[in-house]
Design a protein with these regions (language model features):
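Acidic/polar loop patches that form or flank catalytic/metal-binding clefts of enzymes
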Residues: 78, 197-199
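GST-like fold's C-terminal all-alpha helical module
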Residues: 96-192
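Short, solvent-exposed alpha-helical surface patches in well-structured domains
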Residues: 88-91, 185, 198
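GST-like domain detector, emphasizing the conserved glutathione-binding G-site
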Residues: 1-126, 137, 144-146
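Conserved alpha-helical elements of sugar-nucleotide-dependent glycosyltransferases
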Residues: 11-15, 182, 195
Length: 216
């Protein structure tokens, strides 16, 4: 039995959890908090979540975990069998997580936790995001899923990253930098999925306590 360890606010935890749910894999879940605690560091050397406990040991990093799940449990695949189409899904994931979410994360302190971000950082983030979002728009299909007509691991990530990026850029930069893409319509479609509804509800319910713990 797999055990997914993390907490409901995390986009990356929810990305992995959605992959497990959509593939129909049985798993346990353990809340792990706070970040950087000795107990967490013993399992996750960088003190990050999510991590997953398997019969063979512990794995960290959300994409590593999703790739393991896909290889270990090939039923209900989340990536195409065709090598080129599979690479396209991973390309979208790279744009989304490395070039968009990670960059937008520089704004989260001000957007969500009562901190401040310097004007220089705001300008740098805005410039990087505009370039990267345009690149994502050139590749993403939104027809109806991010990579085309089949739900994939790219959707498991986008469903949770898009709202965070939209909220952060709107609050800190005064503009939703994703507004030029059909993200709103995409999310409306994805939020019809029962598992997405469940995870989103848990994320929203957990968020106030998470913010309080990080701003107190």
């Amino acid at each position: 039995m797999l055990t997914l360890c993390g907490f409901a606010v995390s986009n990356y935890h929810n990305k992995v959890k959605l992959a497990l749910l959509e593939k129909g894999i049985a798993f346990d879940e353990q809340e792990v908090f706070p970040l950087g605690s000795p107990a967490l560091m013993a399992k996750s050397p960088l003190g990050k979540i999510p991590y997953i406990e398997t019969a063979d040991g512990v794995l960290v990093e959300s994409q590593v975990i999703v790739d393991y799940i896909e290889a270990r449990y090939p039923q209900q695949p989340l990536i195409p069998a065709d090598p080129f189409r599979a690479a396209q899904v991973r390309e979208l994931l790279t744009f989304l997580e490395l070039h968009i979410e990670l960059v937008a994360r520089e704004l989260y302190a001000e957007a969500f936790f009562g901190g401040k971000v310097s004007d220089d950082v705001k300008q740098q983030v805005a410039a990087k995001l505009k370039k990267s979002i345009a690149a994502l728009g050139a590749r993403a299909k939104f027809a109806p899923y991010l990579a085309g007509d089949t739900f994939s691991m790219a959707d498991c990530a986008a469903i949770f990253h898009f709202p965070a990026v939209s909220a952060a850029t709107t609050k800190v930069l005064g503009e939703d930098l994703l507004a030029g893409l059909p993200v709103k319509q995409y999310l409306e479609r994805m939020e019809q999925m029962p598992n997405v509804q469940t995870l989103k509800a848990a994320q929203v319910a957990s968020f106030p306590a998470f913010v309080a713990a990080h701003t107190g």
